[in-house]
């Protein structure tokens, strides 16, 4: 049941972070032949098979891939030291040939490097940043800079044989390649009728709470918050 709920959440939120307004800057959509970098800014990535499945998916879509130099490093429960994880993220942001950054997993650790990331090059050549869970830290920071990101599945959570995962993958592909997305959400007796307009922002509640009072704190004024 938990897995089903998580999969559904991924489907519904696969690109909720990027808003349907002209306020935020939208990175260029991907095209066949573009390169996606897989890296781990937080928890240790021991599951090489999961990365291989992610690579196979990218190749199926006609995309090239590059792995972070420190992707499989280990420093306690982190994917390498703070400096190593920061180096991979900075390289991906600065390399104009990298059109999207796909975080391999969440966990904990992105908040330890976020203040040291230089987004100068990213702002000149924005690219998609993809992930959920601990990657909420990146979503929040990049949103404050005025750019869209994608709250979507990651290699560690990718289970290609699960039906709900197939829906999530389809949603991710549509979002990355600029195809229209539609969502059907079941009604609930607890819903209140009404209309709301605004950018959809949010992510992992514990991460949003931990960033309160920091420069990465997400702005919810006039926004639609999803958790």
Where are the model-predicted features located?
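Structural motif
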Residues: 100-102, 130, 224-227
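Bacterial Sec-dependent N-terminal signal peptides
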Residues: 1-22
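Active-site beta-loop-alpha substructure in enzyme catalytic cores
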Residues: 205-227
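ATP/NTP phosphate-donor binding region
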Residues: 19-97
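Conserved anion/nucleotide-ligand pocket segment
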Residues: 148-209, 213
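Short Gly/Thr/Asp-enriched flexible loops that form oxyanion-binding sites at enzyme active sites
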Residues: 107-124
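Short, acidic/small-residue loops that bind anionic groups at enzyme active sites
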Residues: 119-142, 148-154
